[in-house]
Amino acid sequence: MKNLTRRFLQAAMFGCCFLTSLFGAEEKKIVCFGDSLTSCGGKDGRYSDMLQRSLPGYRIINSGKGGDTLGGGLARLDQAVLQHHAQYLVIGLGANDYWRRKRTLNELKKDYEEILSRCTAAGMKIVVISCFGNEKLPPGATLDFDRAGLPLEHYAAGIALIERELVKKYHAGYVPDMQCGITPKGRRDLWSDSNHPNAAGNRIVADTILPELRTILK
């Protein structure tokens, strides 16, 4: 009986190895999750499309949605990210919260942390991409994390502080300024409008993201 059991287990292990070699290992997936800066660029012109060309061994899923905010991203997290069972996440949210200035920095931090916490709990490795990471408060200014309607430069500096704190806490990669290669915006050939890169601009954005992304793919 013991011999039969041993042979059965050996056969089962052989079968698993055979199926793995036949169908390949688990598919490696990266979700790019964000607002219009993730969805812009047109057909084959999004930064995620450029990343796909540089990383042919991965399937890259674009979950960008124009106008999205941190609260909106949290609300659609299951459908846009977690249902894909991806191993990696590139997340860029906060630009529309910055423009609207309707919520406090503490509210934004709470939503961002819940997103990162849930994705980390799902086993995902994360890169946070930003437009604000190099922003600083004006000299002599202080941040009020409990008041909405702050000046734009205060929001930018506050979001940068939130990002730096959370990437450290969740051991995430960080791209402080995803658009550093296409600003100042005098390069009109890289922009489809005043806020959104075109395909040529997104090629540079992808090249800016790629080195940090590779660090979590190792």
Show which residues each predicted segment covers.
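Catalytic His-Asp segment of secreted/periplasmic serine-dependent ester chemistry enzymes
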Residues: 43, 136-218
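Active-site segments of SGNH/GDSL-like serine hydrolases
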Residues: 92, 96, 116-157
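Bacterial N-terminal signal peptides
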Residues: 10-20
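Solvent-exposed loop/turn segments at secondary-structure junctions
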Residues: 36-39, 65-70, 95-99, 132-136, ...
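N-terminal export leaders
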Residues: 1, 5-10
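Serine-esterase "nucleophile elbow" of acetyl-processing enzymes
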Residues: 23-88
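Internal alpha/beta domain cores that form substrate/cofactor-binding pockets in large enzymes
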Residues: 58-76, 80-84, 97-126
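Extracytoplasmic/secreted envelope proteins and their assembly/folding machinery
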Residues: 44, 48, 52, 74-78, ...
